[in-house]
Curated annotation (Swiss-Prot):
Gene3D superfamilies attached to this UniProt entry: HprK N-terminal domain-like (3.40.1390.20), P-loop containing nucleotide triphosphate hydrolases (3.40.50.300)
Source species of the chain: Nitrosomonas europaea (strain ATCC 19718 / CIP 103999 / KCTC 2705 / NBRC 14298)
Signal sequence, renumbered to the chain: none
Keyword terms: ATP-binding, Kinase, Magnesium, Metal-binding, Multifunctional enzyme, Nucleotide-binding, Serine/threonine-protein kinase, Transferase
Binding annotation for ATP: 157-164
GO biological process: regulation of carbohydrate metabolic process
Protein name: HPr kinase/phosphorylase
Annotated binding of Mg(2+), by residue: 164, 206
Miscellaneous remark of the record: Both phosphorylation and phosphorolysis are carried out by the same active site and suggest a common mechanism for both reactions.
C-alpha cells in the first residue's frame, strides 16, 4: 500500500518550497493513503474549495482576503464544511498571514498547518507531481534493476543463476545500478513503471563470495541511479545439457510481461558456459531501441529470405518453361 505522511511531505519539500510549520509548537501528522484517495471523490490538492474540497487545501492571499471579509456566521459555516471533509493538511501560501480563525480551526480539528512564501500555483504544481509519485500503485519484484545505455533493464531469474555477477560486469562496463535483490516498482503513468531501491539496500550489490559491495564507493557516483523507468526485462534461464538447442532461434513474436497492468518487453537469455551475458544484454537493449524506432532485425531478415526464395522460384519457373 502506497502512503505518505504530511511530515514526510514537509521534510522532503521544505527546502525547495520554503515550507514552515504554521504551529511549530504543536506539529500534527496525518497519513495520505492511495486506497483512501482512490475511493474518495475529493481532489488530492488544490486551492481552497468548500464545494469540492481537496485533501490538501492551499490558501493564497485571495483566499485569506475572502475569509477575512466573511461574517462570523458565514465563516463558521465554511469551516464546518472543511471539518466534515477528509482534510489532511492546510497550506497558507504567498507569504499570506494566517487568519486567527484558521489557527483555531486546525488546533480544534488536529489538522497540520503549513505556511510558505512560495506562490500557491508553484506549490500545487510541485506537490501534485510529488504526491503522484509517492501514492502511485506499487509492487516489489526480485531482481536487479540497471540503467543500460540509458534504458531501465531489470534482470530476473532464479536464485544462483548469476544475476548479481552479470550486474557487476555491466557496472564495470559503465552502466548504472538502481536496485539489487528488491526492486520497488511504481506505476507513475498509464504506461510507465518507475523502479527504485529501498533505502536500506541503496548503493549495495550482493555477490556470492564477495558479500555486500558498495557500488557508489567502489565505482563512483556515476555508477548508481536513484530511480529509473523500467522498459525491458531480461530473464536468465538455466540450461540443462543440450537444452539450449530447444530455444527458438528466430522468435516471430515479442514476449511481454504484465506488471501493474503495464506491458513490459521481455527477453529470455539461456545461461550456458562460455556465453558472454553482458554483451548479450547490451545487444538486447540496442535491438529493442531499434525496434522502438521501427527497425526489426528479425523481420528484416525474414523479408530478405522471402524475397530471395521468391526470386529463386521465379528463376526456376523460367528455366522449366524454356525447356
Amino acid at each position: 500500500m502506497s502512503q505518505v505522511s504530511i511530515t514526510q511531505l514537509f521534510e522532503e519539500n521544505q527546502e525547495k518550497l520554503n515550507l514552515q510549520w504554521g504551529e511549530p509548537s504543536a506539529v500534527i501528522d496525518r497519513q495520505l493513503e492511495n486506497h483512501q484517495i482512490n475511493n474518495s471523490t475529493q481532489e488530492l490538492i488544490g486551492h481552497l474549495n468548500f464545494v469540492h474540497p481537496n485533501w490538501i487545501q492551499v490558501l493564497n492571499q485571495t483566499s485569506v482576503n475572502y475569509l477575512d471579509q466573511l461574517d462570523d456566521v458565514s465563516l463558521k459555516k465554511r469551516l464546518n464544511q472543511l471539518a466534515k471533509s477528509q482534510l489532511a493538511c492546510l497550506i497558507v501560501a504567498d507569504d499570506a498571514p494566517i487568519p486567527n480563525a484558521i489557527r483555531q480551526f486546525v488546533n480544534e480539528q488536529s489538522v497540520p498547518l503549513i505556511q510558505s512564501a512560495t506562490a500557491s500555483l508553484e506549490i500545487i504544481w510541485r506537490l501534485q507531481s510529488y504526491l503522484a509519485r509517492m501514492l502511485a500503485p506499487a509492487i516489489t519484484r526480485h531482481g536487479v534493476l540497471l540503467d543500460v545505455l540509458g534504458m531501465g533493464v531489470m534482470i530476473t531469474g532464479e536464485s544462483g543463476v548469476g544475476k548479481s555477477e552479470l550486474a557487476l560486469e555491466l557496472i564495470s562496463r559503465g552502466h548504472g545500478l538502481v536496485a539489487d535483490d528488491v526492486v520497488e516498482l511504481h506505476r507513475i503513468g498509464p504506461e510507465t513503471l518507475e523502479g527504485q531501491c529501498p533505502p536500506l539496500l541503496r548503493d549495495f550489490l550482493e555477490v556470492r563470495g564477495l558479500g555486500m559491495l558498495n557500488i557508489r564507493t567502489i565505482f563512483g557516483e556515476t555508477a548508481v541511479r536513484r530511480r529509473k523507468n523500467m522498459k525491458l526485462i531480461v530473464h536468465l534461464e538455466k540450461t540443462v545439457g543440450s537444452s539450449i538447442n530447444a530455444y527458438e532461434r528466430l522468435p516471430l513474436s515479442n514476449l511481454n510481461e504484465i506488471i501493474l497492468n503495464v506491458g513490459i518487453r521481455k527477453v529470455i537469455i539461456p545461461v550456458a558456459a562460455g556465453r558472454n551475458l553482458a554483451v548479450l544484454v547490451e545487444a538486447a537493449v540496442r535491438n529493442y531501441i531499434l525496434q522502438l524506432r521501427g527497425i526489426d532485425s528479425t523481420q528484416e531478415f525474414i523479408r530478405r529470405h522471402e524475397s530471395e526464395m521468391a526470386g529463386n522460384t521465379a528463376e526456376h519457373f523460367d528455366d522449366s518453361h524454356n525447356e
